[in-house]
Amino acid sequence: MEKIKYLKSIQISQRSVLDLKLLAVGAFTPLDRFMGEEDYRNVVESMRLKSGTLFPIPITLPMEKEIAKDLKEGEWIVLRDPKNVPLAIMRVEEVYKWNLEYEAKNVLGTTDPRHPLVAEMHTWGEYYISGELKVIQLPKYYDFPEYRKTPKQVREEIKSLGLDKIVAFQTRNPMHRVHEELTKRAMEKVGGGLLLHPVVGLTKPGDVDVYTRMRIYKVLYEKYYDKKKTILAFLPLAMRMAGPREALWHGIIRRNYGATHFIVGRDHASPGKDSKGKPFYDPYEAQELFKKYEDEIGIKMVPFEELVYVPELDQYVEINEAKKRNLKYINISGTEIRENFLKQGRKLPEWFTRPEVAEILAETYVPKHKQGFCVWLTGLPCAGKSTIAEILATMLQARGRKVTLLDGDVVRTHLSRGLGFSKEDRITNILRVGFVASEIVKHNGVVICALVSPYRSARNQVRNMMEEGKFIEVFVDAPVEVCEERDVKGLYKKAKEGLIKGFTGVDDPYEPPVAPEVRVDTTKLTPEESALKILEFLKKEGFIKD
């Protein structure tokens, strides 16, 4: 520890902290470091390390150009977490450039910024670094430490229970009766035990918070599973939401924890729908890829179709069987749980979830009309964003909501003082405002943000900071000629004369939203009419009571 004071220090992201931890404990075996260039390119293109071993997801350490260019081969550097705690030292062996489109297209199958990882990748540095790692200390956890188990600890627990077959279950959601049924059926199918292995690291933005989920997993394990055959362990994984490739990766990780079988369900590790409303992955694509490679990775797949509840039988059956037998069935989607039950203060039915789970979820959610949300107005300079924002704020306050208004000009004076107008500084400004907005929303406040925010990927990253449905993107649409006519400050004129550089709409592009929640054409609507249109959307979504 004394020597590290004299070494160069680099802060790494929370994603990289989680990757580092799982590298250190052997969860990513055979990997023991962030990937070098040859491994990286092989994995991206063929899902294999340079040794030929199957490994579908690149595990890399991004670095900003300014930092990467000063690194020297062979030097030792300290890797610190976002709070500046030293976690490991790395001997720099490789510094190499990466390409977002190349990686995203091959690994995720898309470059659509609605994919949460694609949006995040736009903020990574231009380089990856790799080298030998020596751990100083691993991140400490003070929540449910008894369930934060390493691969070695889980393998020892499996051995102590005398289980030669064990099926692992991955989830990032609260568990309900259907998941309980699925896992218990899987145990019977393999004739062994169960590893309940929920992810408590980085999941899909907007998922139910980790503390609520951990409480649910704990109570279900303690009250409804046979402890002689079941192990509960929390996995601090940074998910990529990479669908089929991610399913394979999850299987490799569970093999390293001692599992012999792995449950792969419908839409495994899927981030939902793209900008055009189409699913990123086919529902059973992950099962197909896993089946192809299960023998090679050394863990068998236990596939499941969607299970549905049949009232007349008082049991769950696979949906295809229910259809084949003409059975009447019911199920509740995740969206329906949130919108029709939790946010309305309605109790979830007992056929759907255990009463203890229903109680924990009820404590977490407040009625929809009391929940926080963010209205994000984006558009060209002088399109009318600030005026609409002020009118909308007044309308919401008159209806009893407390509103925070984050206007671009005001933010530049306080929150983002010192930032310029380069693309990097503009993205930083957008993400700063987005972070503040997400914290307000998290605590059930209402925030209206009025910023040019010209870059689609940055806006999508802000969207991903919030629970699904709570980021309302409003495209304040007006052609550049109209905006120029409205410009009382003469900024467009100065930009055209070359007196202002990088001005959006003149010499810097504006990327309009692909699928905004609301579009207001300010050449046809007055500011008041535009604000009313947004208000009507908020009423329709249940954020405002009539």
Swiss-Prot record:
<comment type="pathway">
    <text>Sulfur metabolism; hydrogen sulfide biosynthesis; sulfite from sulfate: step 2/3.</text>
</comment>
<keyword id="KW-0808">Transferase</keyword>
<dbReference type="Pfam" id="PF01583">
    <property type="entry name" value="APS_kinase"/>
</dbReference>
<dbReference type="InterPro" id="IPR027417">
    <property type="entry name" value="P-loop_NTPase"/>
</dbReference>
<feature type="region of interest" description="Sulfate adenylyltransferase">
    <location>
        <begin position="1"/>
        <end position="370"/>
    </location>
</feature>
<dbReference type="InterPro" id="IPR025980">
    <property type="entry name" value="ATP-Sase_PUA-like_dom"/>
</dbReference>
<keyword id="KW-0418">Kinase</keyword>
<protein>
    <recommendedName>
        <fullName>Probable bifunctional SAT/APS kinase</fullName>
        <ecNumber>2.7.7.4</ecNumber>
        <ecNumber>2.7.1.25</ecNumber>
    </recommendedName>
</protein>
<dbReference type="Pfam" id="PF14306">
    <property type="entry name" value="PUA_2"/>
</dbReference>
<dbReference type="InterPro" id="IPR020792">
    <property type="entry name" value="SO4_adenylyltransferase_pro"/>
</dbReference>
<feature type="active site" description="Phosphoserine intermediate">
    <location>
        <position position="453"/>
    </location>
</feature>
<dbReference type="InterPro" id="IPR002891">
    <property type="entry name" value="APS_kinase"/>
</dbReference>
<comment type="similarity">
    <text>In the N-terminal section; belongs to the sulfate adenylyltransferase family.</text>
</comment>
<keyword id="KW-0547">Nucleotide-binding</keyword>
<dbReference type="GO" id="GO:0019379">
    <property type="term" value="P:sulfate assimilation, phosphoadenylyl sulfate reduction by phosphoadenylyl-sulfate reductase (thioredoxin)"/>
</dbReference>
<comment type="similarity">
    <text>In the C-terminal section; belongs to the APS kinase family.</text>
</comment>
<dbReference type="InterPro" id="IPR024951">
    <property type="entry name" value="Sulfurylase_cat_dom"/>
</dbReference>
<keyword id="KW-0597">Phosphoprotein</keyword>
<dbReference type="GO" id="GO:0005524">
    <property type="term" value="F:ATP binding"/>
</dbReference>
<dbReference type="InterPro" id="IPR014729">
    <property type="entry name" value="Rossmann-like_a/b/a_fold"/>
</dbReference>
<dbReference type="InterPro" id="IPR050512">
    <property type="entry name" value="Sulf_AdTrans/APS_kinase"/>
</dbReference>
<dbReference type="Pfam" id="PF01747">
    <property type="entry name" value="ATP-sulfurylase"/>
</dbReference>
<dbReference type="InterPro" id="IPR015947">
    <property type="entry name" value="PUA-like_sf"/>
</dbReference>
<dbReference type="GO" id="GO:0004020">
    <property type="term" value="F:adenylylsulfate kinase activity"/>
</dbReference>
<comment type="pathway">
    <text>Sulfur metabolism; hydrogen sulfide biosynthesis; sulfite from sulfate: step 1/3.</text>
</comment>
<keyword id="KW-0067">ATP-binding</keyword>
<feature type="region of interest" description="Adenylsulfate kinase">
    <location>
        <begin position="371"/>
        <end position="546"/>
    </location>
</feature>
<keyword id="KW-0511">Multifunctional enzyme</keyword>
<dbReference type="InterPro" id="IPR002650">
    <property type="entry name" value="Sulphate_adenylyltransferase"/>
</dbReference>
<dbReference type="GO" id="GO:0070814">
    <property type="term" value="P:hydrogen sulfide biosynthetic process"/>
</dbReference>
<feature type="binding site">
    <location>
        <begin position="379"/>
        <end position="386"/>
    </location>
    <ligand>
        <name>ATP</name>
    </ligand>
</feature>
<dbReference type="GO" id="GO:0004781">
    <property type="term" value="F:sulfate adenylyltransferase (ATP) activity"/>
</dbReference>
<keyword id="KW-0548">Nucleotidyltransferase</keyword>
